């Protein structure tokens, strides 16, 4: 599944909980960095990291360095950044973590399909 496909899946998961994020939000005042998903009121950004198993740009050399700089600058600006993989989107872990960060209760535990209390 391509990164954009994974982002579409995650966007649908968010919408199922009536969470409407800003997409490709430019967060830095001088750099062109963007977050895949942004919940501006909560200062929460979610990045779907593609290519984690195929040796994509984000997992090698200069791409990894650039991402580290981006996330450090986001932290300095007060953002919480949740980085998730495609597998975590598909398994439901990414939406679970997002909901918990927002203080919401997930419908089911993504690992066991049991209701979360």
Residues covered by each model-derived region:
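Nucleic-acid endo/exonuclease domains
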Residues: 1-117
């Amino acid at each position: 599944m391509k990164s954009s496909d994974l982002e579409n899946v995650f966007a649908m998961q968010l919408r199922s909980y009536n969470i409407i994020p800003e997409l490709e939000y430019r967060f830095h005042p001088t750099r062109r960095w963007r977050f895949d998903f942004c919940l501006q009121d909560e200062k929460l950004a979610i990045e779907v990291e593609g290519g984690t198993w195929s040796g994509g740009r984000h997992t090698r050399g200069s791409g990894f360095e650039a991402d580290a700089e981006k996330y450090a600058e986001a932290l300095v600006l007060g953002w919480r950044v949740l980085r998730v993989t495609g597998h975590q989107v598909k398994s439901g872990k990414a939406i679970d973590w997002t909901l918990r960060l927002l203080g919401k209760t997930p419908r089911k535990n993504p690992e066991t399909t049991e209701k979360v209390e």
